[in-house]
Regions:
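Short, glycine/serine-rich, charged loops/turns that create anion-binding
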Residues: 20-21, 50, 98, 141-145
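Generic beta-sheet signal
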Residues: 14-16, 43, 90-99, 134-136
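Conserved P-loop
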Residues: 13-86
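Helix-adjacent hinge/juxtasegments
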Residues: 70-119
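Charged, low-complexity C-terminal accessory regions
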Residues: 3, 8-24, 32, 38-46, ...
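Structured helix-beta-strand junction loops
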Residues: 69-70, 88, 130, 169
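Residue-level signal for inorganic ion chemistry
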Residues: 28, 63, 93, 139, ...
Length: 210
């Protein structure tokens, strides 16, 4: 776990992955809020989704309602996160890596930027090295056997490479499955804040997750 010279408290970078409706967003929000409260740092929500249809807009609205009253300052950044994050003492919830890659890879003019995974990997690795209170959220989408188009397969492979890098660079990684978190930590012991949250989640598992 890293500790900056002028930090207001212990911090960590965390990578959270899970399938749809597995509770990763709620877990990430609660974690970021607790990290900010315990460290006395400002709290930011980095919204990476660029809406393209009503379903996207409804999803964004639902997430906004869920965050209401939690103390987040919202930063909208569908691309170029390194230009949007300035406060190195802040706690940032970046939701999501999945949308970030999609924005960069599938262009508005219909073209496909196949180097997007490499660009995003380098950008997020640099953020991990320069910031010490980041919570990344990503969607797990590698378990089905559907035959996708070449571009979608390259997207899935690229996302997997980014996720792998984040799991290696972050202090801890969390895999969400039906509301149950499995925690992997670089330290010998799981950070207390994550351990306590896991215990709470186990007690409330079975309730509606998102």
């Amino acid at each position: 776990m890293r500790l900056k010279g002028n930090t207001k408290g212990k911090t960590m970078n965390v990578f959270i992955s899970g399938g749809a409706k597995n509770g990763k967003s709620s877990f990430a929000q609660d974690l970021a809020v607790k990290m900010a409260k315990e460290s006395g740092r400002p709290l930011y929500y980095v919204a990476t989704m660029i809406p393209h249809d009503d379903e996207d807009r409804e999803r964004i609205l639902r997430h906004q309602e869920n965050r209401n009253g939690m103390g987040f300052r919202t930063i909208e950044a569908g691309k170029n996160l390194s230009l949007a994050l300035h406060d190195t003492e802040g706690v940032y919830l970046i939701d999501s890596v999945t949308a970030l890659l999609s924005n960069e890879m599938f262009r508005e003019d219909g073209s496909i930027y196949y180097s997007a995974p490499r660009k995003i990997t380098a950008e997020l690795r640099e953020l991990c090295q320069n910031f010490d209170s980041l919570v990344f959220v990503s969607d797990f989408m590698y378990s089905d056997a559907i035959d996708y188009s070449e571009s979608v397969e390259k997207y899935r492979k690229g996302l997997a490479e980014i996720d792998r890098m984040l799991a290696q660079e972050c202090d801890a990684a969390v895999e969400m499955y039906f509301g149950f978190p499995t925690i992997y930590s670089k330290d010998e012991e799981v950070p207390e804040i994550l351990r306590k949250m896991a215990e709470i989640n186990e007690q409330t598992a079975g309730e509606e997750v998102q």
